[in-house]
């Protein structure tokens, strides 16, 4: 949760923002952090994936002039760190800290350098400006809004803004908002978005296979245990098979060291006897994952719908 262009008392706003963040604490139960000054407030609820020990947010630069709150993962953070190791002093092992380094070097012109899924808010205290951005296709959710005092808000879930903002919008994927420009700008554009540009493209199966493997492999970056949700369908089966292929080694060391959790765990959820569960078990047996089947009854499913609806509103 973030608030910018503050016009109300910062300490009163701080309490309000903490209550807003509490509404979405289920998104990040591992750490709660807040930054507050007279112009901006950033509150973060963290789910630890990379660098659980020192990656608490909001992240700050060494001079504490740049403050960053990120929801997401930056898959090419090791490459960026290596490129900038002589230009920026990193304080944590967090994959997201590279955003601070890139901003310090390039200003707002760095979004194309990032390979990942993300929604972030970066406040530049020295220049009293801020940058909000969202990943190319909107994997990570983000909303924005304004209250009656024209204060600008962002949040990972709509319910954090409900009752506070009198105007709320979805922050569009592939866009950024820079406070000095005061309008949304599209930063992600590709020629293949127009059919005319790709209608005659030949498909290279080997190239497609390599791209898919690389996409799955880079997302195995983790300092905590992970698993795959396996339905037995084509998509989840292919992704699970690729994940199993690389699960025994640590991606972070370019497969040079053994993974901390070398066995891939797969999970399937459904009604007992459902055909999806049977298919998932067949795939799990074939690829050799440690498989977990979780069953629920129709009544349990109906009961869960009420609980989920209430959680969305709370």
Residue ranges and their predicted role:
Residues 2, 7, 15-20, 26, ...:
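N-terminal segments that mediate ammonia production and transfer
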Residues 5-15, 86, 125-131, 136-142, ...:
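ATP-dependent adenylate-handling active sites, centered on carboxylate activation for C-N bond formation
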Residues 28, 72, 99, 177, ...:
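Residue-level signal for inorganic ion chemistry
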Residues 32, 52, 143-144:
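AMP-dependent adenylate-forming
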Residues 50, 55-58:
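An anion-binding catalytic pocket shared by soluble metabolic enzymes
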Residues 85, 104-108:
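Glycine-centered helix-coil hinge/cap
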Residues 95-96, 115-117, 277:
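Conserved glycosyltransferase catalytic-site signature
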